[in-house]
C-alpha cells in the first residue's frame, strides 16, 4: 500500500506487531 518494500524489511528486522503498527501510523 504505502511502502510494502520498507514495511516488509522493518517487519522482519524488528517484529510483526511493531512493523504493522508503524506502517499504519505512517
UniProtKB/Swiss-Prot annotation:
Recorded source organism is Geobacillus stearothermophilus (Bacillus stearothermophilus)
Signal peptide residue numbers? none
The answer to keyword rRNA-binding applying to this record is: yes
Subunit and interaction comment: Part of the 50S ribosomal subunit.
Q: Where are the transmembrane segments?
A: none
MF annotations from Gene Ontology: rRNA binding; tRNA binding
Ordered alphabetically, the record's keywords are:
Ribonucleoprotein, Ribosomal protein, RNA-binding, rRNA-binding, tRNA-binding
Per its database record, what is this protein's job?
A: Binds 23S rRNA and is also seen to make contacts with the A and possibly P site tRNAs.
Q: Which GO terms describe its cellular component?
A: ribonucleoprotein complex; ribosome
Protein name, please?
Answer: Large ribosomal subunit protein uL16
The gene behind this protein is rplP
Region Disordered, annotated ranges: 1-26
Keyword presence, Cytoplasm: no
Instruction: Give the family per the record.
Output: Belongs to the universal ribosomal protein uL16 family.
Amino acid at each position: 500500500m504505502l511502502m510494502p518494500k520498507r514495511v516488509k524489511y522493518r517487519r522482519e528486522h524488528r517484529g510483526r506487531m511493531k512493523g504493522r503498527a508503524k506502517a499504519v501510523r505512517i
